Structure formats: structure tokens, C-alpha cells
Swiss-Prot record:
It comes from Triticum aestivum. Belongs to the metallothionein superfamily. Type 15 family. It comes from the Eukaryota. This is Metallothionein-like protein 1. It holds the Pfam family Metallothio_2.
């Protein structure tokens, strides 16, 4: 399950909870501006009802937990 707490959440210079994929960072140097291809796998079909459970989460606030993950994931 992915958690995106929004751009307003950060904890420290190395951890930004608002990043959807924190491992994929932008590089500023000219050598690093090489085109990259990211191949995403195939996921099984979602069953009806799974989305509703995830969409039911609500609330404000976020804090960074272990390994720079949003904690809790209820943003």
C-alpha cells in the first residue's frame, strides 16, 4: 500500500513523506540527465470492495515513521 501524505509533510533533509516513490530522486547534474526507462510489473485484478476500504481512510496529519514512511498512513 502506498501512502502520500502530501507536500506539506517532511521530517529532516533526507525524508520527504510527500514523495510517492522516494527511491526515485531527481538528479541535477548533466551526466545524470540520461533517459531512464522504468518497467512496472503486472498486478492482479483488484476485487470489488478493496478500494472502498482504502478510500474510507480520512483525517489530517502525518508524521514520518521508520525508514522515512508516513506514519500513520491516514493523510
Amino acid at each position: 500500500m502506498s501512502c502520500n501524505c502530501g507536500s506539506g509533510c517532511s521530517c529532516g533533509s533526507d525524508c520527504k513523506c510527500g514523495k510517492m516513490y522516494p527511491d526515485l530522486t531527481e538528479q541535477g547534474s548533466a551526466a545524470a540527465q540520461v533517459a531512464a526507462v522504468v518497467v512496472l510489473g503486472v498486478a492482479p485484478e483488484n476485487k470489488a470492495g478493496q478500494f472502498e476500504v482504502a478510500a474510507g481512510q480520512s483525517g489530517e496529519g502525518c508524521s514520518c515513521g521508520d525508514n522515512c514512511k508516513c506514519n500513520p498512513c491516514n493523510c
